[in-house]
Regions:
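DNA major-groove recognition helix of helix-turn-helix
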Residues: 196, 208, 246-248, 259
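Alpha-helical bundle regulatory/interaction domains
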Residues: 1-189, 199-203, 218-222, 227-238, ...
Length: 273
């Protein structure tokens, strides 16, 4: 299996965490959960011009998209097929970083995925064609980076308040309050929530819950046993029961089940339970 990443240069780096590519991705399990991170991605299937997201309640049902799709601001896990990930390339945005590339408020992509051509028109298909014609993986990264730079140049500017709030929430998601942030930036709580939702896809409260969930996953990564009460305390949960409730809300499984079935990819878990 080939797994490559590419960190873009400024000014793209402040919006995009990294570009990634998989070739020959195979797993024993047929489907897996993709857990919410508070971030958006562009995913381009290079194997065929089609992508699928499966229904959480009935995994025999699915939504079909063109080969290039935008995975929006998800607060619940998604179900994907591992067989369809054999040759893919993607863009992993920073929290709020996708906004200038969407041509719409990020809140309109809350808990949905859409074909990239719904946002970029025929440019999405042209991008996929260019990636398929590229002679090397590095060339693919360079093509993707140039297209993103072009989109950034024509995209909407970001509100300074959203960037400030994201820095506060990323540093201490369990300690920073909406009231304290809105007071510091000079916006009413209602206006602040709207600005934050437009740029990240989430309300501040939901975003902070997802970040706490991600902090918990970091503490669980690679471990065979965990003191759940300590994880709950370290991540700012009121108690262990609140931690387990949030974990199930975002992942659909208990923390103990996740621990047994975790993979090398923290946010990808075999579909069980």
């Amino acid at each position: 299996m080939v797994h490559l990443t590419h960190v873009p240069r400024p000014p793209l780096a402040q919006f995009v965490n990294l570009l990634w590519l998989y070739e020959g991705y195979t797993q024993q399990h047929a489907k897996e959960r993709v857990l919410p991170t508070g971030e958006m991605q562009i995913v381009i299937n290079l194997q065929e011009d089609r992508s699928w997201i499966y229904d959480r309640e009935d995994t025999d049902r699915c939504q079909s998209f063109r080969g290039a799709l935008v995975s929006g601001a998800h607060s619940q896990y998604q179900v994907i097929s591992t067989a369809e990930q054999a040759s893919i390339i993607g863009v992993h945005f920073r929290p709020g970083g996708a906004f200038p590339f969407l041509r719409m408020p990020a809140g309109e992509l809350r808990d949905v995925s859409v074909s990239l051509d719904a946002l970029w028109g025929r440019g999405a298909g042209e991008l996929r064609d260019r990636l398929l014609e590229a002679e090397s993986h590095q060339t693919r990264f360079e093509i993707l980076e140039r297209v993103l730079l072009d989109e950034l140049a024509r995209g909407c500017g970001r509100h300074a308040a959203a960037g400030f709030a994201l820095r506060q929430f990323m540093a201490a998601p369990h300690m920073t309050t909406i009231a304290s942030v809105s007071e510091q930036i000079g916006l009413s709580p209602k206006r602040f929530i709207q600005v934050f939702r437009d740029e990240t896809g989430f309300t501040p409260k939901v975003f902070c819950r997802i970040r706490r969930f991600q902090q918990a996953l970091e503490r669980m990564e690679g471990r065979k046993s965990v003191q759940w009460a300590q994880v709950a305390l370290d991540c700012g949960y009121f108690d262990q029961a609140h931690f387990i409730h949030d974990f199930r809300a975002f992942s659909g499984i208990n923390p103990s089940t996740y621990l047994v079935h975790q993979t090398l990819h923290r946010n990808h878990v075999p579909l069980v339970g």
